Swiss-Prot record:
<feature type="signal peptide">
    <location>
        <begin position="1"/>
        <end position="20"/>
    </location>
</feature>
<keyword id="KW-0256">Endoplasmic reticulum</keyword>
<comment type="similarity">
    <text>Belongs to the glycosyltransferase 25 family.</text>
</comment>
<feature type="glycosylation site" description="N-linked (GlcNAc...) asparagine">
    <location>
        <position position="263"/>
    </location>
</feature>
<keyword id="KW-0808">Transferase</keyword>
<feature type="glycosylation site" description="N-linked (GlcNAc...) asparagine">
    <location>
        <position position="227"/>
    </location>
</feature>
<keyword id="KW-0325">Glycoprotein</keyword>
<feature type="glycosylation site" description="N-linked (GlcNAc...) asparagine">
    <location>
        <position position="524"/>
    </location>
</feature>
<keyword id="KW-0732">Signal</keyword>
<dbReference type="InterPro" id="IPR029044">
    <property type="entry name" value="Nucleotide-diphossugar_trans"/>
</dbReference>
<dbReference type="InterPro" id="IPR050757">
    <property type="entry name" value="Collagen_mod_GT25"/>
</dbReference>
<protein>
    <recommendedName>
        <fullName>Glycosyltransferase 25 family member</fullName>
        <ecNumber>2.-.-.-</ecNumber>
    </recommendedName>
</protein>
<dbReference type="Pfam" id="PF01755">
    <property type="entry name" value="Glyco_transf_25"/>
</dbReference>
<dbReference type="GO" id="GO:0005788">
    <property type="term" value="C:endoplasmic reticulum lumen"/>
</dbReference>
<dbReference type="GO" id="GO:0006493">
    <property type="term" value="P:protein O-linked glycosylation"/>
</dbReference>
<keyword id="KW-0328">Glycosyltransferase</keyword>
<feature type="short sequence motif" description="Prevents secretion from ER">
    <location>
        <begin position="609"/>
        <end position="612"/>
    </location>
</feature>
Amino acid sequence: MNKQVIFGLLLACILVCISGQDEEDYQESPTVLIALLVRNKAHILPMFLSYLEQQDYPKERIAIWLRCDHSNDDSIELLRQWLDNSGDLYHSVSYEFKPEEQSFVNGTSPYEWPASRFKHLIALKEEAFQYGRDIWADYVFFLDADVLLTSKDSLKVLTRLQLPIVAPMLISESLYSNFWCGMTEDYYYRRTDEYKEIYHVKKQGSFPVPMVHTAVLVNMNHRAVRNLTFDRNKLVELQKSRQQEPLYDGPADDIIVFAISANSSGIPLHICNDITFGYILQPLEPGDTLDHDVQQLVNLKSIMVNELGAVPPLLDYYKHLEKKPEKSKLSLDRIFMINLKRRPERREKMERLFDEIGIEAEHFPAVDGKELSTERLLEMGVRFLPGYEDPYHHRAMTMGEIGCFLSHYNIWVMMVRKQLKEVLILEDDIRFEPYFRQNAVRILNQARNAAQYDLIYFGRKRLKEESEPAVENADNLVHAGYSYWTLGYVISLQGALKLLAAKPLDKLIPVDEFLPLMFDRHPNKTWTEAFPKRNLVAFSASPLLLYPIYYTGESGYISDTEDSQQISVETSEEGEARLKSDREQVFDHEQEFKLNPELKLGESLSKSHQEL
């Protein structure tokens, strides 16, 4: 073949390869103006600013527009510190602080929204919008200080979508987020099935919605963007000029006006859940206090540990401001967390959780089923309940299940030996519900006042067909029915004595089968007859206070009981197996916990009218 032909073919191949590469590799990143409005956010600013600065986006392509007024905390001082240390990293910074202004006219609380506050906020957002136009920014990112963008890719992912208006979906302690999937005719939040599908990432991508707020990226290169506004009067004038009917007659609320102005201009709003962008605090109500926001932050940190492995670190010059709650035993004698020596990552994660939510727990070494043998069990005097087989697998006990039982058994023995009156036993693969500490103490007080108890489930898997009557004179306790899992439970000294008196090592079965036998709610009558004295008084928190981190089939799920070696006994033929860690039989309504009535977060409505 001719050398020129060969050279031509090679050149063509090279050009094809180059043209196939992402165009963005040869272009500057879009310029972004980040508009920040701050008021009384000193408790969250170190996290907010740290995660903002840690964005993997060229800072020379970012301009900052920052305003802070009407604050009576250290917000301005923290912002000045950030600008002194990091301001020069950005293309430009426009800021204005007004320390002399500390409250709004007719405002009785920092969390109240009088008309004067709305008017002021709208004027500032309009000013930020115009500033973005003046500096020819490609995007304006309106970002509230209640947002924690823990993903370093947030800004990069959002700008690459090239949508006219898009918001990153943010996670809260509840179902609250920064978007609506439905809006009523009078401009209030409307519940939809799609909302939960997006929030729980049952479907993934970018979806058109009628409302986004709190963290909103606007593409300034979109032609119709010039018509966007936060001002109700400007919106009405725009509608009149276009002869649009009906004219907007809703509240002078910045986020609602913005959404309607986008709709009037034919600009779609999108919410994106492609990645876990970060987290959001729910807006507070006039009667709330700073403690409510601080507790929300504790809850979000707990979620971060579960989802990210740890709370992302602060900037070095803010680390001295990091605060953790004082640790508590929840009015109990001891709290134990059972953990296998060969699972140090679980122990580390749980200890981070205890640090973040303020739990004084002790590590309790688990008995490892991998280190057990038939000979060792005989030496210990362990015998198995004749005829036992797993209800769903139709198999004998596994060494992992034996180790699990012995771990719990050892704590019961210790309780009796040390005369511990009340103990909380936790496993190492759990997540705590929001306000765990407050609600745990509340439930314990209810149990103590209502009746003498032996055991209280904090987390379990109950069966749907079980009837569970409420405990008299208790708001959040039921008489426990047949349940799986021993994720977390409180046991009294009297309860430990009853369990040990049954001599369970003489007729061993898994611990989560043994407990229902002892409070006489087990459906297998043959096994029940093996334990004649079944007088354990067992309650359950309702709703539950903790759940598993993972369920069967989910990424990250590991079982040290179900997947271990079985003991050698005959069982019946196999039927259809269902793992005890299957999500299917967990009650959906138990996910919505009744919060401490003093907190009132569960029944409040946000500034944006979104139901929780």
